[in-house]
């Protein structure tokens, strides 16, 4: 467990405060998890963003009438801190009985509070339900590898040694799997996700990638660090010209977390998948 997470509200009984309380936000430094991967803030081999989508965003108009919307938050992958998920939920719940004169006032408040917690500017979009309905459900790009026949004997830790590639062939492709699962390092609750890998480099053996993804099944770590580990393991193996790893996790507590890591300029579709 991350030392800072021990002091967070995650996994503990919490009072649900219904009026605006920004102090509920609990930042967790990324540095310790970066260090586990041999990284520092100065040596990150990727660009990226963590998309958080909130499906339980509600506040009051000055008249007292409630409003509901979908909140989309983009936290830079290089920010000093992640925001612990339960504290994020408690903070958003504290808006429920708080009046805002305009949507713009709410957006500015969210931007200021979340940016202060993350240590970098956080993007905020407040979207109507009609807008989200019109978008529909997205599908991941490329080939789904989930029907490949593999044998699995261990789930306790990520196993990069399972990965293999054909160095004699250079390919550009996108592949994805819906079999990503890891566990919350604080509560041990399951985190279900889908992951897409896009790259140009030595031809990756698809069955080995699927076995590697499944090896995360009993691994305990935060969503962001799981994606960074996958990115680094593939980068070491493939030595690719380009590499992107993007995971979209199933929501819990009204929030889903979607980490994106890439060697390329950010170009991300934040539309929800079928399980989200």
Curated annotation (Swiss-Prot):
Sample GO molecular function, one term? preQ1 synthase activity
What is annotated about its quaternary structure and interactions?
Answer: Homodimer.
Q: One GO CC annotation, please?
A: cytoplasm
Metabolic or biological pathway? tRNA modification; tRNA-queuosine biosynthesis
InterPro entries (alphabetical):
GTP-CH-I_C/QueF (IPR043133), NADPH_dep_7-cyano-7-deazaG_red (IPR050084), QueF (IPR029500), QueF_N (IPR029139), QueF_type2 (IPR016428)
Annotated localization:
Cytoplasm
Q: Which family does it belong to?
A: Belongs to the GTP cyclohydrolase I family. QueF type 2 subfamily.
In which organism is this protein found?
Pseudomonas syringae pv. syringae (strain B728a)
A Gene Ontology annotation in the biological process aspect, one of them, is: queuosine biosynthetic process
Q: What is this protein called?
A: NADPH-dependent 7-cyano-7-deazaguanine reductase
State where NADPH binds: 85-86, 252-253
Please give the superkingdom of this protein's source.
Bacteria
Q: What is its EC number?
A: 1.7.1.13
UniProtKB keywords: Cytoplasm, NADP, Oxidoreductase, Queuosine biosynthesis
Protein encoded by which gene: queF
């Amino acid at each position: 467990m991350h030392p800072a997470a021990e002091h967070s509200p995650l996994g503990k009984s919490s009072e649900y405060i219904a009026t605006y309380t920004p102090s509920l936000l609990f930042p967790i430094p990324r540095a310790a998890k970066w260090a586990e991967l041999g990284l520092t803030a100065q040596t990150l081999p990727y660009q990226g963003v963590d998309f958080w989508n909130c499906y339980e965003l509600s506040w009051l108009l000055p008249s007292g009438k409630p409003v509901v919307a979908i909140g989309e938050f983009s936290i830079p992958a290089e920010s000093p801190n992640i925001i612990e998920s339960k504290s994020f939920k408690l903070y958003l719940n504290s808006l429920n009985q708080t009046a805002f004169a305009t949507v713009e006032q709410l957006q500015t408040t969210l931007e200021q509070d979340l940016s202060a917690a993350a240590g970098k500017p956080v993007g905020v979009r407040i979207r109507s339900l009609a807008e989200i309905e019109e978008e529909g459900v997205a599908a991941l790009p490329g080939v789904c590898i989930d029907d490949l026949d593999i044998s699995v004997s261990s789930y306790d830790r990520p196993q990069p040694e399972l990965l293999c590639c054909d160095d004699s062939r250079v390919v550009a492709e996108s592949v994805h799997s819906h079999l990503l699962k890891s566990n919350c390092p604080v509560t041990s609750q399951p985190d279900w996700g889908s992951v897409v890998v896009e790259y140009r480099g030595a031809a990756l053996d698809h069955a080995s990638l699927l076995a590697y993804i499944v090896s995360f099944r009993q691994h305990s770590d935060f969503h962001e660090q799981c994606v960074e580990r996958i990115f680094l393991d593939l980068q070491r193996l493939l030595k690719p010209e380009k590499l992107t790893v993007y995971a979209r996790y199933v929501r819990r507590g009204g929030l889903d977390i979607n980490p994106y890591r890439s060697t390329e300029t950010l170009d991300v579709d934040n539309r929800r998948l079928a399980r989200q």
